[in-house]
Amino acid sequence: MMVDSRLLVSDRINGTTNKMNGALDHSDQPDPDAIKMFVGQIPRSWSEKELKDLFEPYGAVYQINVLRDRSQNPPQSKGCCFVTFYTRKAALEAQNALHNIKTLPGMHHPIQMKPADSEKSNAVEDRKLFIGMVSKKCNENDIRVMFSPFGQIEECRILRGPDGLSRGCAFVTFSTRAMAQNAIKAMHQSQTMEGCSSPIVVKFADTQKDKEQRRLQQQLAQQMQQLNTATWGNLTGLGALTPQYLALLQQATSSSNLGAFSGIQQMAGMNALQLQNLATLAAAAAAAQTSATTTNANPLSTTTSALGALTSPVAASTANSSAGAAMNSLTSLGTLQGLAGATVGLNNINALAGTVNIAQMLSGMAALNGGLGATGLTNGTAGTMDALTQAYSGIQQYAAAALPTLYSQSLLQQQSAAGSQKEGPEGANLFIYHLPQEFGDQDILQMFMPFGNVISAKVFIDKQTNLSKCFGFVSYDNPVSAQAAIQAMNGFQIGMKRLKVQLKRSKNDSKPY
């Protein structure tokens, strides 16, 4: 109530409080240091006019923006708004008088008023400059003299080593961000100081968010490097496996019914990871042999032959007799190119439907994804089938690790997927939870590209705050790649977060018919 009485006094003295806060002197634009304020706990029935009447006692209002729910017709207020005063002083006075103090009619809680996220209350990090390529002969006073023409300097510090000597860089904090921006425009690369090899560098100092984002990106890069290294190590270490295991695996993949999987129980002593490696070896051996024996052939035919080898008993027999030779030949560039060709073929699997019995292959994989419950299979056999599912998607991971040049070309082809919301076929669309807030479309694209051809990658952004909602969608052009991504990335830890990756629910799931 003291605030209200003070305002009444100022009205009598000055005619209006607006005059006290510079409203009569303002220009068409707010002051450079003006603050955009977020205001919550306002009645949903209030319009901009009523809000203006609430705020104008503290100073002239430049802009009021009521947040509305556009999904309703007509759009309804969300009970909050943004307000920008012409002067910084007016905004702070309004905050001091209203925040957690005044409760508006019909509301149960007092007004919440604070600088918008974009303003950060004129935080130091928004006004702090990094000065690089500074002469080591300069001290703090020299830096102050150099930058004082641009405004009031709150702090000036030269970075020094343990010996007390200058490291050739400094930090300068101005009173306002506008002053700092003017200093950057005028001083950046404007001169080369004594003892320096390059012109002076003047830019905003890294914020804590910048540092955290850089740390997360480095951590993700290291983890993906380890993943690729481990994956390629698994492939190259399979040469010692016997042809008998390969024959059994080929027989399993060449069958269109689940009865053929009974023979896999002979491998009961092997864990799921070893079985997955077996599947990958079979695919790699078939692709390698096809590459070695086919010359001047159409790439589509080559890939068709490689895929046919995965389902053909004849190819299985050939792979059994020459598995060791195929693995040794993987070290040659020609063979690796054949492996990459097989990968491209998998990405265009629909184009081969008329040549290879793809339906037979995919029907078995579809059974792996949920139709096995009624067959009475043991956990070990189910794990084996799960490993076989990855055989067709695993090749791409190994090709990426072994062929960084070819893989980078694939990367360029998929760049357009970042930010788009194009959906793939049924079972090829993923929902990713618990993404770091710093992650954007490009980050999620790079993270999920090793598992297949990504046709879209999108991180969802809050339209009001312009910040990530920490979830997104990734779509592949085939369900096999999506399954491989789920198995590799579900539970993958980035910083303090552990990703949750699952299939996007079908639109038909909610329909009762």
Swiss-Prot record:
Pfam families: RRM_1
Keyword set, alphabetical order: Cytoplasm, mRNA processing, Nucleus, Repeat, Repressor, RNA-binding
Biological processes per GO annotation: mRNA processing
Annotated GO CC locations: cytoplasm; nucleus; ribonucleoprotein complex
Parts of the chain that traverse the membrane: none
Entry's Gene Ontology molecular function annotations: RNA binding
Annotated compartments: Nucleus; Cytoplasm
Domain called RRM: residue spans: 35-118, 127-207, 428-506
Domain of life of the source: Eukaryota
InterPro entries reported for this sequence: CELF1/2_RRM1, CELF1/2_RRM2, CELF1/2_RRM3, Hud_Sxl_RNA, Nucleotide-bd_a/b_plait_sf, RBD_domain_sf, RRM_dom
Family: Belongs to the CELF/BRUNOL family.
Function: RNA-binding protein implicated in the regulation of several post-transcriptional events. May be involved in pre-mRNA alternative splicing, mRNA translation repression and stability.
Name listed for the protein in its UniProt record: CUGBP Elav-like family member 2
Lineage: Eukaryota, Metazoa, Chordata, Craniata, Vertebrata
